[in-house]
A protein has these predicted regions:
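N-terminal secretory targeting modules
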Residues: 1-72, 129-132
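Serine-esterase "nucleophile elbow" of acetyl-processing enzymes
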Residues: 50-112, 117-132, 137
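Short catalytic/ligand-binding loop motif for oxyanion handling, primarily in non-cytosolic enzymes
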Residues: 81-84, 115-117, 144-149, 234-240, ...
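Loop/turn elements at helix/coil->beta-strand transitions in domains of secreted/extracellular proteins
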Residues: 102-104, 131-135, 222-227, 285-287
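Residue-level recognition of beta-strand->loop/alpha-helix junctions
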Residues: 108-110, 230, 291-294
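Short, amphipathic alpha-helical "lid/cap" segments that border enzyme active or binding sites
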Residues: 116, 120, 205, 209, ...
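Serine-dependent acyl-ester chemistry module
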Residues: 143-277
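Catalytic His-Asp segment of secreted/periplasmic serine-dependent ester chemistry enzymes
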Residues: 235-332
């Protein structure tokens, strides 16, 4: 039995149904989303594909919250969706609802493998389903940076997206003959230079800033405060993880893992540069900014098992990060 199966058996539920080759739905505008009405002991979704949150014995989701007078939103990608959690009650939205003294629960607005443009569009398309929104937290940052290394023909103006190869290949098959497709691919390969790390960071920051501007306008209209949280990576938090993390990381790397694709992004220098530029962008827009990495570093021991992979949390990790995030949000409010 592999370490992934032994230490994180819940990950099979995600890889079977929620991975790129799982039962995803192709949708207008956001491209793809989670399975509808999915039921399992690990993850459950509503009729629109949003994951349920648990709070005080009740469950809520974007498409199933008519019983609420108000709510709070945590939006983002797979970390917010809760990849790694062994059940819905262990996601960030659930743990924040349980650990937060306020009455309105947190609703999970996470979209697996979304970039910042998709995150913003998802919210704009579905906010009419929600009751009054008291607060919005956008926890994001990695996917824009990771996708920024793709060629310009995939990134274009609004950012590359995961599974973009399938989309572009399908479009080409309709638009080109076999000969012209072969020629165009040869030309594309000749110009597919990988951007420098500096260019990747600049592109990701500008894309995030533009989408944050849209988030700010939406939240201003709703009179809901907005906070941007830079999501942490395992190697940003600490150079060497807990023993369980190191076993999982090593096993995943043998299969062509995270470090192989995003090695330079894992460095402290990249983290600090990216963090500072995003913080400056938030300051320009008047948006509250939280660097979760440094807050976690100040709160955990070296042997604490926090991550199931380099970007997703264990159950205990979700609870710890939720508590830290609540504390950070409270500190921001006291200072404002």
């Amino acid at each position: 039995m592999s370490y992934v199966e032994q230490l994180t058996p819940q990950m099979l539920a995600y890889s079977k149904e929620f991975a790129d080759n799982g039962k995803i739905n192709w949708l207008p505008y956001v491209m793809y989303f989670h399975p509808y009405n999915h039921r399992s002991s690990v993850v459950n979704t509503d009729s629109r594909g949003f994951r349920y949150s648990n709070a005080c014995g009740k469950i809520y989701s974007v498409g199933d919250c008519s019983q609420l007078n108000s709510c709070r939103i945590i939006a983002g990608s797979s970390t917010v969706f809760g990849i790694g959690a062994s059940a819905d009650c262990h996601t960030l939205a659930s743990r924040m609802s349980i650990n937060d003294p306020h009455t309105s629960p947190w609703i999970n607005f996470g979209g697996r493998s979304f970039n910042s443009t998709q995150e913003m569009i998802l919210f704009s398309l579905n906010r009419h389903l929600l009751p009054e929104i008291d607060e919005v937290v956008l926890m994001s940052g990695f996917n824009d940076l990771g996708l920024a290394r793709l060629p310009a023909r995939f990134r274009q103006e609004h950012g590359a997206f995961f599974m973009g190869n399938q989309f572009h290949s399908a479009m080409q098959s309709f638009q080109e003959t076999r000969v012209s497709r072969w020629v165009s691919r040869r030309k594309a390969v000749e110009h597919d230079d990988v951007p420098s790390l500096e260019e990747q960071i600049s592109y990701a920051v500008e894309l995030t800033r533009r989408n944050l501007s849209n988030w700010s306008a939406l939240c201003s209209d709703m009179k809901a405060p907005l906070t941007f949280v830079l999501q942490p990576l395992a190697n940003w938090v600490r150079v060497r993880g807990a023993k369980e993390e190191e076993l999982l990381f090593a096993e995943r790397e043998k299969l062509g893992g995270f470090a192989q694709h995003y090695g330079d992004i894992l460095s402290q220098e990249t983290y600090e540069t990216y963090r500072d530029k995003l913080a400056a962008a938030c300051d320009e827009l008047g948006i509250s900014f939280i660097d979760l990495t440094s807050a976690i570093q100040d709160s955990i021991s070296d042997d604490l098992w926090l991550f199931v992979d380099r970007i997703h949390f264990t159950d205990e990790g979700h609870d710890i990060v939720a508590r830290i995030l609540i504390e950070q949000l409270a500190m921001k409010k006291r200072k404002s």
